[in-house]
Amino acid sequence: VSSLADVNKTPNWLDENGDVNTPYNGVEATYLPGVGSGSYAGSFNGGFFGQTEVEHPFNFYENINASNSQGVDMSVSATGVGTNGYATALSLLSNKDEYSFNLLMLPGVIDQETDHSPVVSQAIQLCEDRGDCFLVYDNTNLTDAVSDAKTNTEARNSSYAATYYPWVQIQDATTGNFRFVPPSVVMAGVYHFNDVVGQPWFAPAGLNRGGIDSAVRAYRKLTQANRDDLYDSNSNPIASFPGQGVTVFGQKTTQKKASALDRVNVRRLLINLKTFVASSSRGLVFEQNTSNLRNQFLNVVNPYMEQVQSNQGLNAFRVVMDDSNNTPETIDRNMLVGQIFLQPTKTAEFIVLDFVVQPT
């Protein structure tokens, strides 16, 4: 999804039966979980090459499964287009020179579905291998309980992925009908809004940046105990508050080990920094490996790190690229080595206030 406007256009694709409106036929493929590059246009309906549109009506507000394939063959076979089709798409996205993106979502692919789980596994592996993108995935069906979300989330362990619960209801702008969609459909807009009004290293959650304006209501209204149970299992709750609408109220990754990287904002901070440093370093390749080259790197990276620090992304940092890590042996191996030490800022997720009544 390229902008928040694209997310808001989603309901216009549907008629009152939930099928694709004729004027949008062919356009929807741009936003479905496929990729387009040259002759490759996605994994739908058996077409790997030259196919640019979905050929049958679909209900985008429903999850894809064995009994409701929505035209997507999710079978596993050497020539099939199901998990192998998604595998082809994800393999293409592994080419960092060809594709540049920082968020990956697979609407309609539900992790708990047998045929979908390998797709989610490959998507997580893709993000970990690239190191410059983050996955938001779905792991529950519409009617699944809180306990299902907990169990399914606990089966994953990655700081490059996050999942949310429950599904939310959006309105078809054309007909006024209401449709339930998996969280990944609306989370694209939440992340986009967070980055526009804040920074990528801010938490895409809470009343200031986590509101889901397109959502009418959540499928389940979670109690505080529900939210706590979900958060303990690294599943991010979507809450409903009186007068404040539907709001994302969590920002954990699925990483099990407690560290700074078990939070979405910290992982996305590192993704942002890695992307900048990698881009800045590309022009240094094949230059003379002298102190001038090291200073050139420091003169680009340090100001950017200071900017991130001033925008509340870092408490402290230190960039080391000198004789201590660029020894004569290192230089003889045609290598330039740098180390970046970071102290990321943390979010306030629990506010404790003590009221003390004092005597007059």
Predicted regions mapped to residue ranges:
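Structured, hydrophobic secondary-structure cores that serve as assembly/anchoring elements
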Residues: 1-360
